[in-house]
Amino acid sequence: MAPWLQLCSVFFTVNACLNGSQLAVAAGGSGRARGADTCGWRGVGPASRNSGLYNITFKYDNCTTYLNPVGKHVIADAQNITISQYACHDQVAVTILWSPGALGIEFLKGFRVILEELKSEGRQCQQLILKDPKQLNSSFKRTGMESQPFLNMKFETDYFVKVVPFPSIKNESNYHPFFFRTRACDLLLQPDNLACKPFWKPRNLNISQHGSDMQVSFDHAPHNFGFRFFYLHYKLKHEGPFKRKTCKQEQTTETTSCLLQNVSPGDYIIELVDDTNTTRKVMHYALKPVHSPWAGPIRAVAITVPLVVISAFATLFTVMCRKKQQENIYSHLDEESSESSTYTAALPRERLRPRPKVFLCYSSKDGQNHMNVVQCFAYFLQDFCGCEVALDLWEDFSLCREGQREWVIQKIHESQFIIVVCSKGMKYFVDKKNYKHKGGGRGSGKGELFLVAVSAIAEKLRQAKQSSSAALSKFIAVYFDYSCEGDVPGILDLSTKYRLMDNLPQLCSHLHSRDHGLQEPGQHTRQGSRRNYFRSKSGRSLYVAICNMHQFIDEEPDWFEKQFVPFHPPPLRYREPVLEKFDSGLVLNDVMCKPGPESDFCLKVEAAVLGATGPADSQHESQHGGLDQDGEARPALDGSAALQPLLHTVKAGSPSDMPRDSGIYDSSVPSSELSLPLMEGLSTDQTETSSLTESVSSSSGLGEEEPPALPSKLLSSGSCKADLGCRSYTDELHAVAPL
């Protein structure tokens, strides 16, 4: 060989040795540099290298940013998926590389890289969001994509990875996974590395529950291993990162205990690791909910008892409130025991004392509520004040037998006291009648019996004034609190006036003033106080009736004006032909009775002249009776039934047009059946004296001048026969103004 050839070979050999050592150092250094560089995350980085195209830049995060993965287009699976494995901090780290598919690449906004252990539930996720360029095209289909490194992976463990493009119409489960297995420790690290040597694991790892605490006990390694403390990693099964608890190794015992306090119940993954990461053991433990001592019956009792106590207090409060309301309403019922005993002891003596006779006059033009008040007031006078009351609503038999006007005159003459219940209707019609009478005209309201009664009472009042002032005490005018003193007619100004129920004690004393010598001083005043009158059922019934009248007035303040406002009379109706009867001149009463049960009453009575009589005789008869015949022949404008003429004709009438009793009582209901509440409140002894069959009472105030209606049980033959010799009361009514 030529010398120059030998010289060249030696030169190349030396050069190769020198360059080889440098290349080896460079290769090792670059590997270590790569390991140091790839163990950390990059926020933004290029996704392709040496592709000949523009770089694609992604923004990386750990799937915390929520982007809707569902789209409207199909994006193909990732292509050419490869796994790059290397060691980071003595553990396995991998990087995923792939290329995008051509289908739907123009709609691609990013990727999600999901890494899971095959036989465990651990899951790691990375999200790559396309930053530059904003949109890809088919020229990028061979561009390589690269994920961030996945750290802290186990040696020789099976994993799978999914690269899911988004937004895609396909679901995550529709993309195929890529399976791989991590390499062994000695392939990724040096064989003499401690991490690759077999490591010691505790033989026993015990977990126990103490209330809401969890205690982990394990036997530690021998002292020659050099372990100073252990790390206890724990988390719920479906939570994210582990929580760590440091447990110091106990030197005096062979076991070490670590207490986890106030842990929530659930399924836990517990991992024991030593300080050099050479000892690791994993366990699963289910921590049960803690049953409080207040659970079960104790809790039920603890809940029920307060509810019962609260309900009891609420019930007691309600009862007290209602009792207070009742005390406010019936405050007059509260009487001292001594006063009650005095009142009870006084009752037998009062039964022996004569009961003053009282005649009650009232208006029938103030509605049914006012009539209820009057009826309750009559019962109250009889029950509580110890009076014998004459009320027409109670004695229809006497009215039918004697005649209404005759009955009124008789009761005015017999009664010791005459009480006129004044009201708006009475004031209006009495004043109107007097005005029409003075003016010579004939007004509405004629035929009402209370007008006749008031006129007779006024005449008696004038006579009493002329005789003696003591005789005036017989006449009393009362009005309730829904009326006023102005409702007292002017012709009754001489009478004693009382407002009820404010002046109830004075009224009771007035009614018993004639037997002051028999009673103890102040007895009736105490008995008739506002507090005492609620003690009886009749008093409470009167209270209710007054309240009903107040309510009616509040609902219709102008009820009286609506009912009695003057209006143009309607056209005269056709009147049925009159059948005249002529006979011997005697006056007979023909009573037409409505067939029905025993409670029915006589509906219509008219007088007939049975002989030819001249007009002068008729006029003479009417003047003596105090009647206005011409006014009687016309119907009243206020809607009340007209008086039937005493000496005229007989006309046939059907049951439908027969006049009723104008408010004294309803002919369809027996007067013995009272429609007001609590009327049974009369005491036994007073009920005996005020029974409907034996009482002298009947009202003067509400009836019309009709022949009296007899109960049908008294009319066995179907007709009523009146006395032929009807005596006249012209001597009693000689000064009464004609109606």
UniProtKB/Swiss-Prot annotation:
Outcome of swapping residue 306 to S: In HH18; reduced activity
Stretches for region Disordered: 614-635, 650-719
Entry-linked Gene3D superfamilies: 3.40.50.11530
Keywords, comma-separated and alphabetical: Cell membrane, Cytoplasm, Disease variant, Glycoprotein, Golgi apparatus, Hypogonadotropic hypogonadism, Kallmann syndrome, Membrane, Receptor, Signal, Transmembrane, Transmembrane helix
Pathological association: Hypogonadotropic hypogonadism 18 with or without anosmia: A disorder characterized by absent or incomplete sexual maturation by the age of 18 years, in conjunction with low levels of circulating gonadotropins and testosterone and no other abnormalities of the hypothalamic-pituitary axis. In some cases, it is associated with non-reproductive phenotypes, such as anosmia, cleft palate, and sensorineural hearing loss. Anosmia or hyposmia is related to the absence or hypoplasia of the olfactory bulbs and tracts.
Subunit structure: Interacts with MAP3K7. Self-associates. Interacts with FGFR1, FGFR2 and phosphorylated MAP2K1 or MAP2K2. Associates with a MAP2K1/2-MAPK1/3 complex.
Subcellular locations according to the entry: Golgi apparatus membrane; Cell membrane
Start-end of Low complexity biased regions: 667-702
Residues in the Extracellular compartment per record: 17-299
GO biological process, alphabetically ordered: negative regulation of epithelial to mesenchymal transition; negative regulation of transforming growth factor beta receptor signaling pathway
Protein name: Interleukin-17 receptor D
Signal peptide as annotated in the record: 1-16
Cytoplasmic side: 321-739
Role, per record: Feedback inhibitor of fibroblast growth factor mediated Ras-MAPK signaling and ERK activation. Regulates the nuclear ERK signaling pathway by spatially blocking nuclear translocation of activated ERK without inhibiting cytoplasmic phosphorylation of ERK. Mediates JNK activation and may be involved in apoptosis. May inhibit FGF-induced FGFR1 tyrosine phosphorylation. Might have a role in the early stages of fate specification of GnRH-secreting neurons. Inhibits TGFB-induced epithelial-to-mesenchymal transition in lens epithelial cells.
Ranges that cross the membrane: 300-320
Gene Ontology CC: Golgi apparatus; Golgi membrane; nucleoplasm; plasma membrane
GO molecular function, one term: interleukin-17 receptor activity
